[in-house]
């Protein structure tokens, strides 16, 4: 059975919802899934004042454990067109894994959230994939296999590189049913492709 980690950073809970949906999809695809998050770097008093969702019950990951999985889906908030510093800080601690080649031929995939439709989602998806490629990971994107991302009648999440959601910091827009469905699709797709590669 494929062992998968869904690893995320979420300040306001939007990516937490997407990560849980991706984990559901991966389980539907036959994977044994672990859901974890990266540590918060913002001081607690600042996080509270900024209305961060600080009651997330999902356990915190350690960089060394990434080698324990066949596949890793990373979900991160986007800051100025890049992954959030919390996720970057976590991934920057994986140099020891890189030196050992511990993630070579593992499967990787990425999802992101932004506060606006033009908030740099595709840049964040691709730059996060770069980190995975430096580790020798095999990238499985959302791709246009997920057809529900097509059309512009409403705000739709998704890009060929990975699933996206647009959610306002004030909570007025949460991940939509279509965006959560896309996260489930991506999780299932990664599980099924990983099973073919590692099964």
UniProtKB/Swiss-Prot annotation:
GO function term, MF aspect, one = FMN binding
Q: Which domain of life is it from?
A: Bacteria
What are the residue boundaries of the Flavodoxin-like domain, all occurrences included?
A: 4-190
- Which residue stretches does the UniProt record annotate as biased composition, category Polar residues? 163-177
**Which reaction is catalysed here?**
a quinone + NADH + H(+) = a quinol + NAD(+); a quinone + NADPH + H(+) = a quinol + NADP(+)
**Keywords attached to this entry:** Flavoprotein, FMN, NAD, NADP, Nucleotide-binding, Oxidoreductase
**Cofactor detail note:** Binds 1 FMN per monomer.
List, separated by semicolons, the cofactors it needs.
Answer: FMN
Give binding positions for FMN: 10-15, 78-80, 113-119, 134
Q: Where does substrate bind?
A: 98
Which residues are involved in binding NAD(+)?
Answer: 12
For this protein, the record's InterPro entries field holds: Flavodoxin/NO_synth (IPR008254), Flavoprotein-like_sf (IPR029039), Flavoprotein_WrbA-like (IPR010089), FMN_Rdtase-like_dom (IPR005025), NQO (IPR037513)
The family database entries (Pfam families) matched by this protein are listed as: FMN_red
Keyword NAD assigned: yes
Q: What class of enzyme is it?
A: oxidoreductase
Q: Where is this region: Disordered?
A: 158-181
EC annotation from Swiss-Prot or TrEMBL: 1.6.5.2
Q: Which GO terms describe its cellular component?
A: membrane
The family assignment reads: Belongs to the WrbA family.
NCBIfam families linked = flav_wrbA, PRK03767.1
Q: What is this protein called?
A: NAD(P)H dehydrogenase (quinone)
């Amino acid at each position: 059975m494929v062992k998968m980690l869904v690893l995320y950073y979420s300040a306001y809970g939007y990516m937490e919802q997407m990560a849980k949906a991706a984990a559901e999809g991966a389980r539907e695809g036959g994977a044994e899934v672990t859901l974890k998050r990266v540590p918060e770097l913002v001081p607690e008093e600042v996080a509270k004042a900024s209305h961060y969702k600080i009651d997330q019950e999902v356990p915190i990951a350690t960089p060394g454990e990434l080698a324990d999985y066949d596949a890793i889906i990373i979900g991160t908030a986007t800051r100025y067109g890049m992954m959030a510093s919390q996720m970057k800080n976590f991934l920057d601690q994986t140099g020891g894994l890189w030196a050992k080649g511990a993630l070579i031929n593992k499967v990787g995939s990425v999802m992101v959230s932004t506060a606006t439709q033009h908030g740099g989602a595709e840049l964040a998806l691709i730059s996060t994939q770069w980190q995975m490629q430096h580790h020798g990971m095999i990238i499985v994107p959302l791709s246009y296999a997920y057809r529900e991302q097509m059309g512009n009648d409403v705000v739709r999440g998704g890009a060929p590189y990975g699933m996206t959601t647009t959610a306002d910091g004030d909570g007025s827009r949460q991940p939509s049913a279509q965006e959560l469905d896309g996260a489930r699709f991506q999780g299932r797709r990664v599980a099924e492709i990983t099973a073919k590669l590692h099964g």
